[in-house]
Amino acid sequence: MPKKIFLLLFSLSIGIAAHAQSLYSDSVYNKYLDFNLARLQGEQDKVLELGEALLPFADKLPEKARINFYFSVGKMYEDNDEHSKALPFYEKVALATPNYYVVHRALGYLYLEKAKGIESQLGASTASDTTINHQLTLAYTEAVRKALPHLEKAQACDPSDETLAIIKTLYKNIKDDQGLNTLDSRLKELGKNCVDILDDK
């Protein structure tokens, strides 16, 4: 008899815990919906507040909703000129949905911005600063190499003369003739699988 009572109590506690978990997940999803509504209505201050409040609980969202949320948070930070905060969220989205070219465009241009900052420092340094110039050249090349794959995916899926010109210029700047010469074949291959809208259901 005590064994049956124990099993009954154990089953009840599992049921209550499962119900509480379900309510908790529903609450997180409702906060996600509130965040999206604020975004759609252009309430920037509210978007930032709701987005940052939801971040610690994002892992409770369904996978597709979580990926969509991360993209929206990246966009939120990018629009707020907090690019270093946007990058990790965009990177998560690119990792989860590698064919979603919109996130690649965002990443490509954010990394390009970093490369341009380094390029400006290079232009401002004197020729006698060989050590500094060497370090800046390495940093510039690294930033360009981060930007290029993202810009190429965006170009392959949504061609733009401006993006193509930037890609070609970057290859010339880092003196990568092989990368430049094989660009067309890479773009053709990258263009085979393109996603332009994230589904959150």
Task: Please describe what each predicted stretch is.
Residues 19-57, 64:
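N-terminal leader/linker segments that initiate helical-solenoid repeat arrays
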Residues 34, 73, 107, 114, ...:
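Structural register within alpha-helical repeat arrays
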Residues 40, 62, 75-81, 108, ...:
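Short coil/turn linking the two alpha-helices of tandem helical-hairpin repeats
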Residues 69, 103, 163-164:
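TPR alpha-solenoid repeat register
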Residues 97-98, 157-159, 192:
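Short coil turns that delineate tetratricopeptide repeat
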Residues 113-153:
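Short coil/linker segments at helix-helix boundaries
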